[in-house]
Structures are given as C-alpha cells and as structure tokens.
C-alpha cells in the first residue's frame, strides 16, 4: 500500500435498497452489526473495518447522477466477500437465520471454500474460508 495515496482505504460503501426496514433487520440479524446513524432514508451500520450505508434506492440518484440506480433484477455488478476461519459455523448461523445459500459450500480453484447469498435488496455476499 502506498502511504502517500489516500485512496487505498475504503471507509464506507452505500448499498441501494427498496425496503429499508427489511434491509436493516437483515443486516442486524445476519451480520450482528450495530446502527451508527439512521434517518427516514438511510441506515448506516458498522462492520469491523467498514461502514455500510443502506440507502433507499429512490434517494440514490442524488449520489450517482447522471447515472441511474439499478434495480434488484438488473444483474449483479459486484460481490462483497468476507473471509472467516469457520465456514461451517457461519453456514449454521445463516441457516438459523433462514438465509438461503445460492452456492456452496464449494471448493474454489483459488484455494477457498465459499458460499454465496443475497440480502433482501439482491446484493450478493460471499463468505469464504481458506482451505489448508
């Protein structure tokens, strides 16, 4: 990492959602995150090293103009990944939270075992464990 380049540290990401209460409940329940800020159009939650801002999609155009905000059925353009030491334990927690796995657990060619799922707004999440 170049210490002179301040653009190498991602501090927060904004995810556009259609149902803010459902997204908030999902993130608190599945990820165990706490709410840092909340207003009628957004909820900011704190991961260990990142803030995720859940923002109503109807408000997102002010951030991305002149581009438009894609809907949940417009296709995946990114995936957020979390690396863990106990994928089986995470899978058990996801099952207890009624989270449907889209893939996995499966061994990937790059040496990780992974699962994927989506949040209520359709954002894709991958959880992976390094295989020894």
Residue ranges, per PLM feature:
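Conserved active-site tyrosine of GNAT-family acetyltransferases
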Residues: 23-27, 94, 122
